[in-house]
A protein has these predicted regions:
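Peripheral, non-AAA+ core regions of ATP-driven protein-machinery
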Residues: 1-110
Length: 110
């Protein structure tokens, strides 16, 4: 049970931790560790998580997707709201839009 464990998070140097877009990645890594199930290495994600589990939109989503593609990621989990106005024609990676944390976890862990 996660409530009975201590959680430590190691953030790589140079990463901005005051950016709410990191919320989805942090909670996904904690769940991955608790379940002892790895997140596929080609998956990237960005999203702010609200108190009720909704995935809120983040700024600069096109820039984030572009950088993820340059780094070799194949799948990107993002807030569904960020799909509005997104030029998907130039994006080669698979985009997985989600509204709730549960949807993101299904995309990650089946």
């Amino acid at each position: 049970k996660l409530a009975q464990k201590d959680v430590f998070l190691n953030i790589a140097g140079g990463l901005k931790v005051n950016d709410p877009a990191i919320d989805l990645a942090v909670i996904s890594s904690i769940l991955s560790s608790n379940m002892d199930t790895a997140i596929e290495p080609e998956v990237c994600m960005a999203g702010e998580i609200g108190l009720s589990g909704e995935i809120r939109p983040v700024n600069r989503i096109e820039q984030r997707i572009g950088e993820a593609e340059k780094l070799g990621f194949k799948r990107f989990i993002l807030p569904k709201y960020n799909m509005q106005g997104l030029n998907t024609k130039k994006i080669k990676m698979e985009l997985i839009p989600v509204r709730k944390v549960e949807e993101a976890f299904r995309a990650l862990f089946g």
